[in-house]
A protein has these predicted regions:
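Bacterial N-terminal signal peptides that target proteins for export
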Residues: 1-15
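Short linear, low-complexity motifs centered on an aromatic residue
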Residues: 2-5, 27-32
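Short linear motifs in intrinsically disordered/low-complexity regions
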Residues: 11, 21-22, 34, 40
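C-terminal segment of classical bacterial N-terminal signal peptides
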Residues: 15-29
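A residue-level marker of the well-folded mature domains of exported/periplasmic proteins
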Residues: 32-369
Length: 369
């Protein structure tokens, strides 16, 4: 899901940044009194992939089920809507013609189509996961995945016997690089000498490439495999090879119960339920530049721990989670990159704009294609 293509979900925001600029684009600002539905709420969702993909889309579907219980109504949905206007617009309009007045998207590539739809249907509220467009009746949202990946890194550092960790990454974009760096910083909190060897697959969801990358990292000595790709394949390979891993998107113990130490998971219901209630109540004011969600507000969280994480280490990780929930910043200074260049000064925190365009790595991270 990227401007470079057609990139898959959850990862396109980074590519919209100009140096120092905002990462969301906007439509005209919301009216002072906000957006209010004209009829009773009827909600529909457009899924990028199948609801049982084991990752990104399934996390949204699981959130849908929880949201239905919270708001007391069913949510319609359609699966496998590709990032193409010729598919997105008809899918959304089909629901709108049936009375839907709240439409939720789940892909970066829906951004422009949702902008057009929001302008065409001013009485419909639009939300889009990992989108980049916003307006008076449109809000994009994404989570700060580096927070949960930092905690997964702590689990990896605690479980590793060698201090050599591997990481299967999709593409070398800021939104992926910030998870790699956070994973490394978390691991180094438990073991200051921990290293993270990274292989990029060049794809968001390619189990064949993910299997090859995970196997190569293990062959190179990694005894824990982290990931920022859509499928559970790296965890499956870790279990097959007798090492450990940390998952992404969902709790991947389902696929590798012996190997998976913990997972960085989406908890979309924690954000979407209150956001939908605001829309339903009336006077909704979408965030001007979209919602960049912290863990405490329902972005991501962790699921685990596996038995390889000692209880005392699990307690430390839980304490760090509590600190993050209270406002601890992962990218607080002083912080230098692997070449010794200062990236965050003492007393400062890395800006959101710099997060989205992150192209540097902390000490101990080794990247390869």
């Amino acid at each position: 899901m990227q401007q470079l293509r057609t990139l898959t979900p959850g990862l396109g925001l980074a590519m919209t940044i100009a140096a120092g600029g905002a990462f969301f684009t906007t439509l005209p600002a919301a009216a002072a009194d906000g957006f209010t539905l004209k009829d009773k709420p009827k909600i529909a969702m457009l899924y990028f992939g199948p609801k049982n993909d084991g990752g990104w889309t399934q996390a949204f579907d699981e959130a849908r089920v929880k949201i239905e219980k919270e708001i007391g109504q069913k949510i319609q949905f359609v699966e496998n809507v590709p990032e193409d206007a010729s598919a997105i617009k008809p899918a959304a309009e089909k629901f709108i013609q049936r009375g839907a007045n709240i439409v939720i998207g789940t892909a970066f590539g829906y951004s422009d189509s949702f902008k057009d739809l929001a302008a065409k249907y001013p009485d419909v509220a639009f939300l889009n996961g990992s989108g980049t467009t916003n307006g008076s009746n449109l809000e994009s949202f994404y989570g700060r995945t580096y927070e949960s990946q930092y905690l997964c890194g702590m689990a990896a550092g605690a479980a590793s016997k060698t201090g050599k960790l591997g990481f299967v990454a999709a593409n070398p974009f800021g939104v992926v690089n910030w998870t790699i760096n956070a994973f490394a910083l978390g691991a180094q909190k438990m073991n200051p000498n921990a290293t993270v060897n990274v292989i990029y697959t060049g794809a968001w969801n390619d189990p064949v490439k993910e299997r090859a990358a995970a196997a190569a990292l293990i062959d190179q000595g990694a005894d824990v495999i982290g990931q920022h790709v859509d499928s559970p394949t790296p965890q499956i390979v870790a279990q097959e090879r007798g090492v450990y891993g940390t998952g992404h998107h969902r709790d991947l113990r389902q696929f590798a119960p012996k190997a998976t130490l913990c997972s960085s998971v989406w908890v979309w219901d924690r954000f979407l339920t209150p956001e939908l209630k605001k829309i339903i109540a009336g006077g909704w004011k979408p965030a001007q530049y979209g919602a960049f969600i912290e863990m405490k507000d329902g972005g991501t969280d962790i699921a685990g721990f596996g038995p390889a994480v000692p209880k005392d280490k699990a307690a430390l990780i839980t304490a760090e989670r509590d600190a993050i929930m209270k406002g601890k910043q992962i990218y607080a200074g002083p912080l230098a990159d692997r070449d010794g260049k200062e990236r965050v000064a003492k007393g400062a925190v890395l800006s959101d704009a710099d997060l989205w365009k992150m192209d540097w790595f902390v000490k101990g991270v080794v990247t390869q294609k």
